Amino acid sequence: MKFYESGDSSKPVIFLFPGTCCLYSSFDHILDGLHSYFYTVTVSYDGFDPNEKTEFYSMEDECEKIEQEIKKKYGGRIKAAYGCSLGGSFVSLLIQRKRIHIDHGIIGSSDMDEAGRLVAKIKSSMVVPFMYKMIHTGVLPKFMQKKLNKTDEVKKELYNGFLNMFGIGKGGCPWITKQSIYNQFYSDLVTKVQHGIDVPGTTIHVF
């Protein structure tokens, strides 16, 4: 796991958490805007960083490393954390664990889907072959590319922005293994996020 810091370190700290199978670089286009208000720390999960050879094991394992980083560098407290999709689950989990403090948790487009272990294994096993080939090569399946080509320019720009988060159209991500993809999907499904999380001093924003 790596943490990519940028901006003015005297400003409040915000941690940014990518979505499922997404790269830390998916936040690159908004960093300049955020630097007006925050010192940014973009989280790059184990198994999904091009600059190290690791494998994603579980959300709990990743949370422990994130908590250690926040305790070591930021005194155990940060101003904000934003996560989309899987990243939103990480923000929720970090808040409910209460091992560090986040003033504002911002959750975007997180379905908070959960499943039992058997169903999670089946779902993850079904997803891996499709996702692995697409992410590994950086090329959409032909039927998806044809559908994309038929959309209008506004939608196409939106879809391409979404696909770029997975490295699609950027040469692919050959360092990401099938096991990392499986473990990330499986762990997200079986890791329970509490309902009605209420931590004094923390405000949770959901959109």
What is the predicted function of each stretch?
Residues 16, 81, 107, 205-206:
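Structural beta-sheet core signal
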Residues 29, 93-97:
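Active-site signature of alpha/beta-hydrolase-fold catalytic machinery across serine-
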Residues 41-82:
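Active-site loop/oxyanion-hole signature of alpha/beta-hydrolase fold enzymes
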Residues 82-91:
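Gly/Ala-rich beta-loop-alpha elbow adjacent to hydrolase catalytic centers
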Residues 176-207:
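Conserved serine/cysteine hydrolase catalytic core
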